[in-house]
Curated annotation (Swiss-Prot):
NCBIfam families: PRK05610.1 (NF004123), uS17_bact (TIGR03635). One of its GO terms (biological process) is translation. One of its GO terms (molecular function) is rRNA binding. Keywords: Ribonucleoprotein, Ribosomal protein, RNA-binding, rRNA-binding. Part of the 30S ribosomal subunit. InterPro entries: NA-bd_OB-fold, Ribosomal_uS17, Ribosomal_uS17_bact/chlr, Ribosomal_uS17_CS. The gene is rpsQ. Gene3D superfamilies: Nucleic acid-binding proteins. Pfam families: Ribosomal_S17. One of its GO terms (cellular component) is cytosolic small ribosomal subunit. This is Small ribosomal subunit protein uS17. Disulfide bonds: none annotated.
C-alpha cells in the first residue's frame, strides 16, 4: 500500500460501539454512546446514536463491542464498515 493510501485510510473517522442488531444480511446496527457536558448546567449527559455498518462475513453478533470506520456509501443508510472486534459478547 502506498504512503498516500495509508494516510488517507487513517484519516477516516472511527467509532466504538455495541452491536444491538444483527438481523439484516451483511449489516449490523451499532449503538455508539458518548458523554457530553450540558452547556448550561455542566452535568455530563449520555448521548447515543445508531449506525448501520457493513459486516461482509456476518460474523459480528448482538452484544459484541466493535470498532466502525467511515467509508463510502453502500446503501441509503449504510456508510460505515466494521473494522475490528474490540470485545466479544459475554454469554450468560
Amino acid at each position: 500500500m502506498t504512503e498516500a493510501a495509508q494516510t488517507e485510510k487513517s484519516l477516516r473517522r472511527t467509532l466504538v460501539g455495541r452491536v444491538v442488531s444483527d438481523k439484516m444480511d451483511k449489516t449490523v446496527t451499532v449503538l455508539v454512546e458518548n458523554r457530553v457536558k450540558h452547556p448550561l448546567y455542566g452535568k455530563y449527559v449520555l448521548r447515543s446514536k445508531k449506525y448501520h455498518a457493513h459486516d461482509e462475513a456476518n460474523q459480528y453478533k448482538e452484544g459484541d463491542k466493535v470498532e466502525i470506520q467511515e467509508g463510502r456509501p453502500l446503501s441509503r443508510t449504510k456508510s460505515w464498515v466494521v473494522s475490528r472486534l474490540v470485545e466479544a459478547a459475554r454469554v450468560i
